[in-house]
Regions:
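Extended, Lys/Arg-enriched charged tracts that mediate electrostatic binding to polyanionic substrates
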Residues: 1-26
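Loop/helix patches that line or flank the sugar-binding groove of alpha-linked glycan CAZymes
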Residues: 19-222, 227-233, 238-242
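Solvent-exposed beta-hairpin/edge-strand motifs
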Residues: 239-253
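C-terminal beta-strand-rich structural cap/linker in extracellular carbohydrate-active enzymes
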Residues: 261-293
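Tryptophan (W) side chains
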Residues: 296-297, 307, 312
Length: 326
């Protein structure tokens, strides 16, 4: 999410600070880029299983379909909100399935279909061809025969709407597309990193109060990806006393669950529901104000920026839904 940069440094699980180039990935540096545009970030492509099929095999069988949809959204969010160019495999937003086929180049339309009407995702059409899949048939067969693992049209529509919101988030602010290694190294951090990091949770901050002013409407964004099956509470001491609120994209968006996200101003504490990605924004303060452009808010919410109204000055400072003023 920080551009896969070789020189980007962060605190690792053992408490040491390392650069991307110092992280080993199967004998190769995990961070290898000098600039974010050198990397294309994705979670599925034409090779191997689709995202939906991969989650089918990896999530516990008893995982509800609604949670599977949320995990699909979380997976796509790791690329949509990354500093690199983002790539989505065709149909990833529609829960597309190839019935667990890991190499479908010669499997025909039966396994490669893509239904843009959002009625059927293609799961359960039969065992995938043996050439590249037979070793997995022992796992594939019971999964493909399980009706609970096939999404209904309503699930596909929900996944599509959530994916649309991710695209709106990405283009709601240039802070998700800084475009240079220097800006990423200046502005992007992961406050929950290190040995005390919460399993299944990523917290990313993009601080627009340092370096060049990129978004004249914001002082920064805080992204929380909570892949766990419980709500997570994260405190960012550097944001204590600061006013953050849920992005207008999500406040007006398709997902009712994310709207339960809360922010406690006094301590800089955010609580995000289970299996949810939340993006909180901080409006630009007078200290960093340079003829702030509020068009980003209007284009994403359809309303005038709320800090232009008197209600902003009289807003409460207690724990409230993060979609409200705090």
């Amino acid at each position: 999410m920080a551009g896969n940069l070789r020189a980007y440094s962060f605190q690792t699980a053992d408490g040491t600070t390392r650069t991307g180039a110092q992280i080993d990935y199967n004998g190769q540096p995990a961070g290898y880029a000098d600039s974010p545009e050198e990397v294309i970030t994705y979670v599925d492509a034409h090779d191997n299983q689709t995202l939906f099929d991969s989650l089918t095999l990896k999530l516990p069988t008893a995982t509800s379909m609604s949670d599977r949809v949320r995990m699909n959204t979380l997976s796509l969010a790791t690329t949509a909100l990354a500093q690199t160019p983002s790539f989505w495999h065709a149909g990833a937003d529609l829960l597309r399935s190839k019935s667990l086929d890991k190499n479908s180049f010669n499997s025909g339309d039966w396994f490669n279909s893509l239904d843009f009407t959002k009625q059927d995702n293609g799961f359960g059409r039969g065992l995938p061809p043996s050439a590249d899949n037979q070793a997995m048939w022992v796992y594939d067969q019971p999964a493909l025969a399980n009706p609970a693992l096939k999404p209904a049209a309503a699930d596909i529509r929900a996944a599509s709407a959530a994916a649309d919101d991710l695209l709106r988030l990405r283009f709601s602010t240039d802070l998700f597309r800084l475009g240079s290694a220097n800006l990423i190294e200046q502005k992007v951090s992961f406050p929950d990193g290190g040995p005390t990091a919460t399993p299944g949770v990523i917290v990313m901050r993009v601080d627009d109060t340092v370096g060049r002013d990129i978004d004249r409407g914001l002082d920064g964004v805080l992204v929380v990806l909570n892949a766990s099956d419980e709500a997570t509470t994260q405190t960012v001491p550097a944001l204590a006393g600061r006013t953050l609120m849920l992005s207008p994209v999500q406040a007006k968006g398709s997902d009712p669950v994310v709207k339960a996200t809360t922010w406690v101003k006094a301590s800089g504490t955010v609580t995000v529901p289970a299996r949810t990605v939340a993006v909180l924004v901080e409006k630009q303060s007078e200290a960093h104000h340079h003829a702030a452009d509020t068009s980003w808010w209007q284009s994403t919410s359809g309303q005038s920026a709320p800090w232009q109204a008197a209600s902003w000055q009289s807003a409460a400072t207690v724990c409230t839904p993060a979609g409200s003023l705090v």
